[in-house]
Amino acid sequence: MAEEIEVEETEDFHDMDFNDEEPSCSGGAVQARTERFVVKKWVAHAMWGWDVAVDNCAICRNHIMNLCIECQADPNANQDECTVAWGECNHAFHYHCIARWLKTRLVCPLDNKEWVYQKYGR
C-alpha cells in the first residue's frame, strides 16, 4: 500500500510544469524568470497545544498552571515556587501535592503505578 502511494506521488510530481531553463545571455540582455503568482498578504495563525490530558491536578483539583492549595494558603507564596511534576506515566500534578501524596503512598494517584519523576518545572 505504501509503495503504491509513493508511485502515485512521483507520477504527480512528474506531471508538474516546471520552468527549469537557465536564463541565457544573448546580445547582453538577461532574460528574467516570470513569476507565476505574487503573495500579496499572508496571515499567520498559531495554535498552542498542551500535551497533558487533564488540566487539573487530581490531588487538589486546582488548575495545573495555578497555585496549589498549599501555596494558596501561604501569603508569601510565589507563582514560580508552585511547579508542576510529571511522572513517567505522563500524569501531571502540582509538585507540592504529589510530594505530600508520596509521603504515604509511592504510587501515582491516577493509575496506581509506581511513581517515578519524569520532570518537574513550568
From Swiss-Prot:
The RING-type zinc finger domain is essential for ubiquitin ligase activity. It coordinates an additional third zinc ion. This is RING-box protein 1B. It comes from Drosophila melanogaster. PANTHER family: RING BOX. Component of the SCF (SKP1-CUL1-F-box protein) E3 ubiquitin ligase complex, which mediates the ubiquitination and subsequent proteasomal degradation of target proteins. Through the RING-type zinc finger, seems to recruit the E2 ubiquitination enzyme to the complex and brings it into close proximity to the substrate. GO terms for biological process: cell population proliferation; lipid storage; protein neddylation; protein ubiquitination; ubiquitin-dependent protein catabolic process. Disulfide bonds: none annotated. Its main location: cytoplasm. It holds the Pfam family zf-rbx1. Zn(2+) 3 binds at C89, H91, C108, D111. Residues 1-28 are annotated as: Disordered. It is found in: Cytoplasm; Nucleus. Highly expressed in early embryos, and in pupae. Widely expressed in adult males, while it is weakly expressed in adult females. Part of a SCF complex consisting of Skpa (SKP1), Cul1, Roc1B and a F-box protein.
